[in-house]
Amino acid sequence: MKPYLISDLEIISAGAEGKAIGKVDGLVVFVPFVVPGDVVDVEVYKKKKGYAEARLVAIKSYSPHRVDTQCPHFGLCGGCKWQALDYQQQLLYKQQQVEDNFAHLGKFDFPPLQPILASENIFYYRNKLEYTFSNLRWLDDEDMTLQKNGKTIEPRGLGFHIPGKFDKVLDIKHCALQEDPSNELRNRVKEYAIAQNLSFYNIRNHEGLLRNIVIRTSSTGEIMVIVVFTEKSEKTMSLMQFIKDEFPQITSLQYVINTKLNDSITDLEVHLYSGKDFIVDTMEDLTFKIGPVSFYQTNSQQAYRLYSIAREFAQISSEDVVYDLYTGTGTIANFVARQAKKVVGIEYVDAAIEDAKINSEYNKIKNTVFYAGDMKDVLNRDFICQNGTPNIVITDPPRAGMHATVIDRLLEMEPKRIVYISCNPATQARDITLLDAKYKVEKVQPVDMFPHTQHVENVALLVKR
């Protein structure tokens, strides 16, 4: 279709994927990087039955809920699409998202939602970021102007993928999501690599030495850096030595050789260059070892509050057998173990289960057991006979929710309480509907884990009827 202009579109709500919503002549228009209350001119570039997608052309009048953004890349980077929206308004829309999903997609009664738990830090809250090297840097308007005027533009960049452009990377100057030394480290590594003429990866033809850099931090002050190369060479090892020399505060410096077409490193060997091969984080009196490919909630401070809510909802006693479904690296299982008789954790990823066992051992917790495998296959009658019928189940499935077989097994086991943690209230509402015959929703607590994004976590307490 040929793009066309809509003038004076009033933005009335926040919608899916972090986009905002306007309406004109019965057509719903999705626009990124604007906020409810703005009046804007937009260019429609995609139109389907009942809705259209548009890009911002001009803001005609500003919403009272619009705030100044901290990020110099806002409007290009897709990471923090709600950053221009006042944080209290963000919370209202996230709360409404849970309410709407439960009301419209669920077929069950539920009590009034508890007020959403805000994040204490709305900037610099992430403990992990991954940046991509690319020799196809996204050129912004300023770059294009300089190029037209005959200036040579550096094509290499280190940053985040541009939304919708698989082969383009936005070169990041400053990211307000992770505390220092994240920004300084990323910028210094890029400068060194360019000065030494190290080749940046080209995702189209799969050439270039430098692929990714992962930076992990912890509440204890420890720092892990993992650099991903396509080969080990004198040049790549010189970069590792540069990082070690320039950033002595790094406690775990590692590298990976990845010659695959995709960026995943979970199935690859991680090589230790200096320091330890892990960092540690703490919650209460527990210490968690985090390896290079370990899953760990990226907002540590808010994760502690989320797990505290789950533990409070569960009301675990010393006689309770607890099943922790989709346990990941066993963080929740270990967090609640001291209140329980026994905790059984199940997770699909083998490496995560090994981390879970290590963390139990590290904290001298002896009443946990962990199993790896597909939940719908592992959680069978023989498994329950072997491990005991649970009194309490804590479940934290991926965005797709729980498999119908798992829900059927929950209905068979009939635990007295189910604590359902979800990063997708839509699939959570679907699953709770299937559990409604035997369980009523007693409490609902939304939690904001990711400020400036549309994502919301939700904890629901289900009690046996």
Indicate where each model-derived feature is located:
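Terminal RNA-binding accessory module
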Residues: 1-73, 369, 377
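Rossmann-like S-adenosyl-L-methionine
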Residues: 2-8, 16-17, 233-465
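Short, acidic/hydrophobic/Gly-rich beta-strand patch recurrent on exposed beta strands
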Residues: 20-25, 158-162, 228, 356
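Extended interfacial segments that mediate partner engagement and assembly in macromolecular machines
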Residues: 58-69, 75-199
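Short, solvent-exposed loop/turn elements at beta->coil junctions and helix N-caps
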Residues: 114-121, 203-204, 210-212, 446-449
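Internal alpha/beta scaffold segment
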Residues: 167-203, 207-209, 217, 231-254
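Short, aliphatic-rich beta-strand segments
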Residues: 215, 221-230, 287-291
